């Protein structure tokens, strides 16, 4: 607990921590476990763009969220609050925290905003509370909150299997991405129940992805048939490149070799679309923020 006292004494009040978005560069479902969870294969690409989580240590043990991370989500149900309380319980610490999130990542778009925010809370409070828990421990805690949380805890681009928690770090080339949020949200369980969803894809290898033969997302045909807004975005993006879906949607993206090319493509899209140009990250900016606290 000495680190908390030092930080308070030094006048460091609120601290800001990045929570990057992600893309699934492909996604296929290969089967189902006995407990009903689906098995998948995917590649997680971290981005240089996302939310910012602001944290302030409390001495009274309370975990409080200030404002609304997501409209309509209660403080107790919010992943950032749950992450902080889970870490507090697992570590047996009496420290508390106040949490505020500046949201940029669209909710329900498959860009990983909620999972990334939760991971950032775990990693940052582990440092701010002086707990010293290993990344493996934090990733295991994160898995209790969501299958995507561990990749954000570890902060590396990764080939993922299992329910998404079996991670193999991989190197990805520099790239820029044109992102579009169609503005619709279909709950993932409803998509998994769809009769159109392919659930028995053949197991692939990392070499298959490296060869460029894996680009499809199993949820794409389901969403394009089900949601006219998603189909409209795919049609618009197909004029500037090869559109893909991230996660279970509804977010869409096109990959480009350079930011300039992505910006040029953005200029050709209808102004009514909610779109961004971002770049892929070699690793999570959260790791850089963590390193800065240890200097």
Swiss-Prot record:
Pathway connected to this protein: Isoprenoid biosynthesis; isopentenyl diphosphate biosynthesis via DXP pathway; isopentenyl diphosphate from 1-deoxy-D-xylulose 5-phosphate: step 3/6
Active-site residues annotated for this sequence: 22, 148
Gene Ontology BP terms: isopentenyl diphosphate biosynthetic process, methylerythritol 4-phosphate pathway; terpenoid biosynthetic process
Pfam families: GHMP_kinases_C (PF08544), GHMP_kinases_N (PF00288)
Signal peptide extent: none
Reactions this protein catalyses: 4-CDP-2-C-methyl-D-erythritol + ATP = 4-CDP-2-C-methyl-D-erythritol 2-phosphate + ADP + H(+)
InterPro entries in the record: GHMP_kinase_C_dom (IPR013750), GHMP_kinase_C_sf (IPR036554), GHMP_kinase_N_dom (IPR006204), IspE (IPR004424), Ribosomal_Su5_D2-typ_SF (IPR020568), Ribsml_uS5_D2-typ_fold_subgr (IPR014721)
Cross-referenced HAMAP family: IspE
Biological function: Catalyzes the phosphorylation of the position 2 hydroxy group of 4-diphosphocytidyl-2C-methyl-D-erythritol.
Family: Belongs to the GHMP kinase family. IspE subfamily.
Name of this chain's protein: 4-diphosphocytidyl-2-C-methyl-D-erythritol kinase
Organism in which the protein naturally occurs: Xanthomonas euvesicatoria pv. vesicatoria (strain 85-10)
Gene designation: ispE
């Amino acid at each position: 607990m000495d680190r908390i006292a030092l930080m308070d004494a030094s006048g460091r009040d609120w601290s800001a921590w990045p929570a990057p978005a992600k893309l699934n560069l492909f996604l296929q479902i290969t089967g189902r476990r006995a407990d009903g969870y689906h098995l998948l294969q995917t590649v997680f690409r971290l981005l240089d763009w996302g939310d910012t989580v602001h944290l302030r240590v409390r001495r009274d043990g309370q975990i409080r969220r200030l404002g609304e991370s997501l409209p309509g989500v209660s403080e107790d149900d919010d992943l950032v609050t749950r992450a902080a309380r889970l870490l507090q319980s697992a570590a047996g610490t009496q420290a508390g925290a106040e949490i505020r999130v500046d949201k940029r990542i669209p909710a329900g778009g498959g860009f990983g905003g909620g999972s990334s925010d939760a991971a950032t809370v775990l990693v940052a409070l582990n440092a701010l509370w002086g707990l010293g828990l290993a990344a493996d421990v934090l990733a295991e805690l994160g898995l209790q909150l969501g299958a995507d949380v561990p990749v954000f805890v570890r902060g590396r681009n990764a080939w993922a299997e299992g329910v998404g928690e079996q991670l193999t770090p991989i190197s990805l080339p520099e790239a820029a991405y044109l992102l579009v949020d169609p503005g619709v949200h279909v709950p993932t369980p409803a998509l998994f129940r769809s009769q159109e969803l392919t659930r028995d894809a053949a197991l692939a290898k990392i070499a298959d992805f490296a060869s460029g033969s894996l680009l499809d997302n199993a949820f794409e045909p389901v969403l394009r048939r089900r949601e006219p807004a998603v189909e409209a975005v795919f049609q618009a993006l197909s004029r500037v490149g090869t559109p893909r879906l991230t996660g279970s949607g509804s977010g869409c993206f096109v990959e480009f070799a350079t930011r300039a090319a992505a910006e040029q493509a953005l200029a050709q899209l209808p102004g009514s679309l909610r779109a961004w140009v971002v770049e892929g990250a070699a690793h999570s900016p959260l790791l850089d923020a963590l390193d800065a606290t240890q200097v």
